[in-house]
C-alpha cells in the first residue's frame, strides 16, 4: 500500500484547489485542500485512508472519534479498515460534545480522526471532551497534515500526507493587491 500517491489522488478528486482563498484563520492562500471532494469518491477515499490505517497498525487504540463534519466520514472509513468502533463528536450550542448514544468509557484509548489538520483546534476540542469522559487520546489521524512548523498538538499525528500551503495576512496578499476576488471555503466561521 505504500506506493499510493496521496497528492495525485487529491488532485484527481479535485480536492486540491488553486485560486484565492480566505481561510477560517482570516489569512489568505493561493491553494486550498477540500477533502470533501475526495470523500465523495469512496474508492479513492478508501485508498487514501488505507495509508493512515497502515500507520496505525502499531498503535494501541480501541475507538476512533471524528469531529463533525470533516472527521465523520474519515472516522467511519478508518473504523472499517481497522475493525474498531468509529463515532463522532459534534457541536451543540457551539460546544463540542459526544451525544446520540455514543460514549467514551473510562480507559478507552482514542484516535481522533480528521480530514485536514491545520491549527488542531477541532482536534483539541474533541480531546478535551474525551479526557473529561475518562478516555485517553493516543493520536490524531488525518488525511492531510497542513500544520505550520510552530503548531503543536501534544499528540502524535498520523497523516496520509503533509502539505505545506503558504498563507498570507490580508495586507501582504499578492492576490488581493491584484484585485483577484477570494473564495471562502470550508465549514468554520471566518475570523
Curated annotation (Swiss-Prot):
Range of residues in the leader sequence: none
Record's keyword annotation contains Glycosyltransferase: yes
Binding-site residues for orotate, renumbered to this chain: 118, 146
UniProt xrefs under CDD domains: PRTases_typeI (cd06223)
Catalytic activity line of the entry: orotidine 5'-phosphate + diphosphate = orotate + 5-phospho-alpha-D-ribose 1-diphosphate
S-S bridge residues: none
Protein's recorded name: Orotate phosphoribosyltransferase
Organism the protein comes from: Clostridium botulinum (strain Loch Maree / Type A3)
